[in-house]
Curated annotation (Swiss-Prot):
The lineage of its organism: Eukaryota, Viridiplantae, Streptophyta, Embryophyta, Tracheophyta. It comes from Oryza sativa subsp. japonica (Rice). Disulfide bonds join C32-C47. May play a role in plant defense. Probably has no oxalate oxidase activity even if the active site is conserved. The keyword Isomerase does not apply. Belongs to the germin family. This is Putative germin-like protein 12-4.
């Protein structure tokens, strides 16, 4: 019985440790304002000396109440991210946020956040949103979609491919997203696959997408933009 309890305890500790490592590390003090000028390189950013911290380290005049320009985006969207690189006080706090503006028929293209879960609420307009599950045993990737209206909330699980689309022909939309990391990261699928530097071999992509290399060469020749600011 003692051996059984020992192995059970060991398994539990391993599980807890795994969960702890699956998100940003917890702070060990009241705050750890990022010192962006430190030569130290760690998994995150080192702390500024507490005596040098001021209230402005926790403040950013981000103008998130103002509409952002979507006209320069082929996707028809503009993501204004507030992460630790813009607001040093977020360091070790496991949170960031973004304002997302969508032109009529604009979208935030399929992408993932490798280090964060996202919760999104619609402030203006309507959005068609969804995410796709990881590879399943039945070889199906299930798609979950929903049309959101003003005030609605939707959550995108960490690391899963997801998107938002404004279905209106004449009305813009606005959303606010909160993310469970000070630096959630974003991988826009089309940009990463077709617009990487240097490019992925067209032999690889042609076989992966089961099309000819001419189609792949055309896709890789397009301009793949970043709609995140």
């Amino acid at each position: 019985m003692a051996a059984s309890n020992f192995f059970l305890l060991t398994a539990f500790i391993a599980l807890v440790a795994t969960q702890a490592m699956a998100s940003d590390p917890s702070p060990l003090q009241d705050f750890c304002v990022a010192d962006k000028h430190s030569p130290v390189r760690v998994n995150g950013l080192p702390c500024k000396d507490a005596k040098d911290v001021s209230v402005d380290d926790f403040f950013l005049a981000a103008n998130l109440d103002k509409p952002m320009d979507t006209t320069k985006s082929k996707a028809g969207s503009n993501v204004t991210l507030i992460n630790v690189m813009k607001l040093a006080g977020l360091n070790t706090l496991s949170i960031s946020m973004a304002r997302i503006d969508y032109a009529p028929k604009g979208q935030n293209p399929p992408h993932t956040h490798p280090r964060a879960t996202e919760i999104l609420t619609v402030l203006e307009g309507s959005l068609y949103v969804g995410f796709v599950t990881s590879n399943q045993a039945n070889r199906e990737n299930k798609l979950f979609t929903k049309t959101l209206n003003k005030g609605d909330v939707f959550v995108f699980p960490q690391g899963l491919i997801h998107f938002q689309f404004n279905p209106s022909y004449d009305k813009p939309a606005v959303a606010i997203a909160a993310l469970s990391s000070q630096n959630p990261g974003a991988i826009t699928i089309a940009n990463a696959v077709f617009g990487s530097h240097p490019p992925i071999s067209d032999d690889v992509l042609a076989k992966a997408f089961q099309v000819d290399k001419k189609a792949m060469d055309w896709l890789q020749a397009q301009f793949w933009e970043n709609n995140h600011n």
